[in-house]
Amino acid sequence: MKYRTSPALPVLTLILAVLVAPRAWASVYELPADGSPVVGTDSSVKSAYEDTLTDIAHRYSLGYYEIIRANPHVDVWLPGAGKDVMLPGRRILPPGPREGIVVNLPEHRLYYYPKPHGREKPVVITYPVSIGKMDWRTPLGATEVIAKIRNPSWYPPESVRKEHAENGDPLPKVVGPGPDNPLGDFAMRLAAGHGEYLIHGTNNPTAVGMSVTHGCVRMYPEDVAALFAIVPVGTRVRLVNEPVKVAWVGGELLLEAHPPVDEEGQTVEPDLQVLSAKLDHALGDSSAAIHWDLARATLQAANGIPTVVGIAADKPDAAAPTPQTSAANPSR
């Protein structure tokens, strides 16, 4: 399901409004009634002659890293006509409360859980985002939306102006609304820090889904417009660092891995201990067959695609992933 919205409207009304939007590919998923954290499905499209992978990513509300990692053998700028392009859409929701906004930094993705009205079924809406680059990390932790601004002006801090000046690209003290404003047409101010962090749009959609900002959360223009319309001031926001996510679905253990980032926002090597801890926690007291080599390979590939790495012992095809049977992994 795909869509667009407005502040105090019921969820169903919001979804219907989004479905008729000019570009309606923001992903809207009904939350599973059984509490499962897995939503969505993967799909694919054929590229047109004039397409780039970034064009396709924008069209289907995917980020830059997201689409290139899912299509490692496709040229980013010249995929060619008729090339099969995977659209990664199956996701394991980040752990924690399913409320407000959750931004998972390693995933370069934002999740919004609007409050359902009456008997409406709860949904999650998800968008790709850019986050802070090296030395300009996006802060982790709990915060909230404290203001919403249409047509924002940008007041680049002195540190940013200095950086641009050193690169031969001096900035004015104020950049007013318009096509040259990197904040785009909509911004939501967070309480984090001293209020300097925003969720905002962009005048450079090609860079959405990367680590390129000065700490803000950047979205496609259409996506931030849709989110701006439905998120009230006071909405809770959690910024998390969850490069490894696991979940049980139908007796299968899924692993989703993204390149981890450290406290400074830099990409670091995958941590096998984190993988082991996540899998052990998911197993609990249950008996399962785990394919540890496949789990480690999935961690190293870090392509963000949920992969079956284990089968519950009581599932009929428990031997499917040719695993080592046991919750313990002696080679960890």
Predicted regions and their residues:
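Cleavable N-terminal signal peptides
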Residues: T13-L14, A24
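Gly/Pro-biased beta-strand-loop elements
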Residues: R91-N203, A226-A229, A257-S331
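LysM (lysin motif) carbohydrate-binding repeats in extracellular/periplasmic proteins that recognize
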Residues: A48-L78, P122-V123
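Loop/turn positions that initiate beta-strands
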Residues: E50, G80-V85, G234-V237
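Primarily a LysM-type cell-wall glycan-binding module
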Residues: V28-S61
